[in-house]
């Protein structure tokens, strides 16, 4: 039994990939959602099948919906309908044919625009479908039942969902099936002129009609909501009071009137939008002139600011020159106040000496030293610091004597004697006395 369930699950998983290229893309997206990090989609497909089987083993009952159950068209896994049902459907018009009154309304709809007519989804997916799918393109049970109900002219009855044809479809799914059968997947935006006509066609051909009340619907005039309240729109003219019998013609007249009202409102709104655009352009023009004026003022202010900066720099330079000149003058005045002979003594008292006297005294001293004999001259000349005694010269704290291996003891002794001015030689020289 488990083998049969596994086979059904595999068929349910593989059925999407056999429908069309769109089905393959949907399967790939589902597999990527199941395992985003996978690189091999076949492996993830096997994992998905194993996951469903594991849920069933744990006690859960996952409901696997086929494409025919959800969308109402037959896939390759769905069993083809029996020939008895097909023979019963031959009395009704075929699925691809429209009623006799369709060409009259189709002339008003321009080409190149899709309407909300019920179109079988199998026809839209015929390009990417397999050859096996071509056999069942016209066997859409839901659409055939809907068109069978359209053939009957009963207007006061409503047709429900054919639950006997789809026993496993839930109520919420029934709504999705009906919507998918009536409305295409991709409907482009229609113009205002042809929306009412397309709605008329879709409502006239579909089986989902509103129940009509006991009162006459023609007695009610169309209403229009304005700022002041509700207003009833009545037709003016000689045929205002006369109205023809109910039916498709009256409905068509109503829809035409509504479409003309829509076009009139659109035409009335167009000049308003044009006037608004003109006002916006007129308001933009003075703003542009203001910006131009502001830019011109900024350009004029730039050279003024440059001139002000140049003046400030010139004033700073002049101030610096004046400060330098003031310092030079102050230095000159200091030198002028103190003459050359103006000498300050140690006690702090100032005494003025003549420079000529000092020069004469120096000359006299030099002449005296020249005239004296050499002995006296030697006494007058000041002795150097090296020849001065210990009393006059500053005492030396320490003095080093460099001694090498080549230096002898006598040399070291002589160096020490020269430093200390002491004769430390043990050698005593005996000299005879000179005769008198």
Swiss-Prot record:
Coiled coil: 264-334
Phosphoserine modified-residue sites: 129
Gene it is expressed from: Ccdc71
Biased composition (Basic residues): 329-340, 373-386
Region span, Disordered: 95-119, 210-258, 314-405
Keywords of the record: Coiled coil, Phosphoprotein
UniProt-recorded name of the protein: Coiled-coil domain-containing protein 71
Biased composition (Polar residues): 105-116, 344-359
Pfam families (UniProt xref): CCDC71L
């Amino acid at each position: 039994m488990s083998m049969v369930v596994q086979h059904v699950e595999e068929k349910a998983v593989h059925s999407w990939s056999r429908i069309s290229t769109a089905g393959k893309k949907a399967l790939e997206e589902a597999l990527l959602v199941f395992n985003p990090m996978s690189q091999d989609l076949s492996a993830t497909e096997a994992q998905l099948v194993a996951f469903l089987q594991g849920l069933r083993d744990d006690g859960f009952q996952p409901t696997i919906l086929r494409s025919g159950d959800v969308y109402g068209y037959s896939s390759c896994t769905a069993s083809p309908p029996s020939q008895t049902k097909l023979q019963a459907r031959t009395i009704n018009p075929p699925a691809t044919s429209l009623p006799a009154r369709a060409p009259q309304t189709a002339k008003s709809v321009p080409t190149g625009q899709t309407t909300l007519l019920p179109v079988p989804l199998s026809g839209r997916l015929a390009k990417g479908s397999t050859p096996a799918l071509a056999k069942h393109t016209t066997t859409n049970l839901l659409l055939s039942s809907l068109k069978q109900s359209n053939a009957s002219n009963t207007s006061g009855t409503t047709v429900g969902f054919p639950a006997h044809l789809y026993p496993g479809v839930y109520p919420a799914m029934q709504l999705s099936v009906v919507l998918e059968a009536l409305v295409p997947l991709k409907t482009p935006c229609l113009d205002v002129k042809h929306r009412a006509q397309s709605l008329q066609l879709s409502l006239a051909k579909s089986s989902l009609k509103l129940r009509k009340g006991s009162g006459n619907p023609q007695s009610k005039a169309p209403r229009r909501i304005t700022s002041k309240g509700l207003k009833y729109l009545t037709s003016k003219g000689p045929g205002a009071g006369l109205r023809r019998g109910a039916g498709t013609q009256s409905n068509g007249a109503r829809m035409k009137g509504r479409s003309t009202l829509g076009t009139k409102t659109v035409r009335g709104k167009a000049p308003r939008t044009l006037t608004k655009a003109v006002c916006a352009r007129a308001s933009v023009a003075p703003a542009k002139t203001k910006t131009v004026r502001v830019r011109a003022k900024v350009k004029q202010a730039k050279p003024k600011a440059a001139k002000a900066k140049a003046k400030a720099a010139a004033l700073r330079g002049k101030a610096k020159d004046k400060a330098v000149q003031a310092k030079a003058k102050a230095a000159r005045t200091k030198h002028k106040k103190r003459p050359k002979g103006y000498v300050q003594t140690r006690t702090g008292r100032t005494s003025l000496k003549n420079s000529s006297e000092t020069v004469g005294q120096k000359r006299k001293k030099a002449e005296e030293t020249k005239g004296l004999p050499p002995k006296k001259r030697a006494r007058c000349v000041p002795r150097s610091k090296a020849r001065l005694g210990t009393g006059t010269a500053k005492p030396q704290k320490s003095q080093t004597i460099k001694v090498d291996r080549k230096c002898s003891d006598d040399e070291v002794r002589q160096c020490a004697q020269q430093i200390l001015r002491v004769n430390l030689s043990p050698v005593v020289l005996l000299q005879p006395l000179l005769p008198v």
